[in-house]
Amino acid sequence: MYEVKTYYCDGIPTDKDLERAVDATWIYNCMVELRWFYYGEYSILIKPGEKWEDVKANKMPKKYPV
C-alpha cells in the first residue's frame, strides 16, 4: 500500500508538471494525485513506475469543454 501525495497545478498541467509528478513517485515511493482546475476539476493518479509519456498519452483528457 502506497502513500498518496497531492499536487496542484494552475490550469492544464504542462510536460514539466507531469515530469515532476512522475519524479515524485520515484523519489518518495508513493502515488501522486495531480489535480487542476480548467472549466471544472480534473485529477489523475500516477503510480510508481509509470513514465510521463505514458501518463500524458493515456491518462490526460483528450478534450476540454470550451
Predicted regions and their residues:
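Acidic, low-complexity, intrinsically disordered interaction modules
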Residues: 8, 12-57
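Short aromatic-glycine-(Arg/Gly/Cys) micro-motifs in beta-strand/loop hairpins
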Residues: 1-6
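Short acidic DE-rich linear segments
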Residues: 64-66
